[in-house]
């Protein structure tokens, strides 16, 4: 895992300021190796990257969230929410069959009670799927007073069923959350002009890579 960091670092000849464990495999299903890698990235005799610049993101493996909290790790934790209800999230993320929305939010509360640290909830906005005003209202009820940050992520389009929400819809969604009890931010991805944004990296034509 750390080799990936070093490979990129040596390729771009620039300082890498942040590391996020997510995608290309669920981090909490490779729990110990991910934690070991984060420790090496953070260690003063390793990469010496500040702990506050390292984030581990999970789709919501509840037993591992609890373990992570109890072990007292100092790296940020993020959960991919992506739905405003159990039925909706189940259609987007099959993991909801095993770990329900209510159980996931409770695990986020448990994480806060144990660690006293804010958690980030990630919410990818999908046109016509989870970007309605009613979704914003449900999120405010679902999340309630949980000490957290809701990170809204406009979808980066690739060939497939989902599409990016319009700028107008994104703005309306954000405005609806203006009076929520939690912080709301928007993550604008870079590299989308070359299909290199978050979630876009893929081999489009295998013939070109033989």
Language-model features and meaning:
Residues 179, 189-210:
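Radical SAM enzyme core and accessory elements
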């Amino acid at each position: 895992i750390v080799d990936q960091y070093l490979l990129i670092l040596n390729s771009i000849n620039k300082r890498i300021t942040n590391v996020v464990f997510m995608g290309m495999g669920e981090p909490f299903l490779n729990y110990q190796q991910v934690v070991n890698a984060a420790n090496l990235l953070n260690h003063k005799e390793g990469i010496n990257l500040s702990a506050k610049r390292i984030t581990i993101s999970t789709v919501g493996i509840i037993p591992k969230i609890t373990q992570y909290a109890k072990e007292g790790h100092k790296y940020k934790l993020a959960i991919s929410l992506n739905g405003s209800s159990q039925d909706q999230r189940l259609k987007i993320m099959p993991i909801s069959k095993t770990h329900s929305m209510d159980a996931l939010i409770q695990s986020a509360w448990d994480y806060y009670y144990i660690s006293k640290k804010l958690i980030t909830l990630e919410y990818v906005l999908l046109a016509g799927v989870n970007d309605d005003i009613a979704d914003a209202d449900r999120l405010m009820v679902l999340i309630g007073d949980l000490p957290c940050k809701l990170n809204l992520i406009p979808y980066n389009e690739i060939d497939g069923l989902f599409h990016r929400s319009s700028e107008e819809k994104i703005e309306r969604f954000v405005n609806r959350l203006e009076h929520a009890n939690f912080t709301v931010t928007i993550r604008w991805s870079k590299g989308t002009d070359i299909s290199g944004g978050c979630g876009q990296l893929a081999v489009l034509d295998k013939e070109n890579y033989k």
